[in-house]
Amino acid sequence: MRGDEGARSHLSGGREASMQVREGMSEMVLTVGPGHTLRAVAGLMSERAVGAAVVMDPEGHGPGIITERDILIAIGAGQDPDAESVAEHLTRDVVYASPDWSLEEAAAAMVRGGFRHLIVLDHGETVGILSVRDVVRCWTEDGAICPLPSRAAVG
């Protein structure tokens, strides 16, 4: 599904600006497997200062996502982060964004779905991840294109 490339929003005192997901997403994606423990993934997320990891399924079911919220819910429910695997807690029914979507479309998808991260796919390949933080960073008062976080890293 492609976004409307002509979508506009009124930002910065009425000045029109339009940005695409590709301009705000991080191309440095933390990738983990479904067999990782929750503790291992939490450690990787902490080291890289990210709130989500793309879960690549070796059986080819498409990328899923595990977030800090998923880990907190599991631990809060009394589950052992050293014994619980990502496969038991990841989101498989993922809404994917296109790099051509406007940030407005991505933000609307996040609001509708109640989540804070979108995996960005281009022709079926993961090309990035977009977080609420990325969207907010892009919607600055001056409308500047945002630099990527310096601590983002590939896992």
Language-model segments: residues:
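N-terminal cationic amphipathic segment used for targeting or macromolecule association
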Residues: 5, 15, 40, 50-51, ...
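Tandem CBS (Bateman) regulatory domains
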Residues: 11-28, 67-96, 102-111, 126-127, ...
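A glycine-centered beta-loop-beta connector
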Residues: 24, 45-48, 53-69, 110, ...
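The conserved cystathionine-beta-synthase
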Residues: 31-49, 56, 97-114, 121-122, ...
